[in-house]
Amino acid sequence: MDLLWLGYDGLSVRYADVKAVLFYRPTLDGRIVRAYGHVPANVRAVVVTTDGAFWPSSWRPDQLRQRWALWRGGG
């Protein structure tokens, strides 16, 4: 199973479940809390999955998008 690690211990999502990568904004905090339970330190991006969950990431959005694009292209 190909997993995208989001920069926090134990927090990964399946590449196949990624729907979008957003820049972090405080207005997304409520959605992050619903998915993860709290807003961790150093959030730079938010990964939206096909089930509508908003997951925090300490990676920059461009880094996540590059890794996601490589996975979609077959590596």
Mark where each language-model region is.
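Short, compositionally biased strand/turn segments
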Residues: M1-D9
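Acidic, Ser/Thr- and proline-rich intrinsically disordered linker/docking segments
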Residues: D9-G75
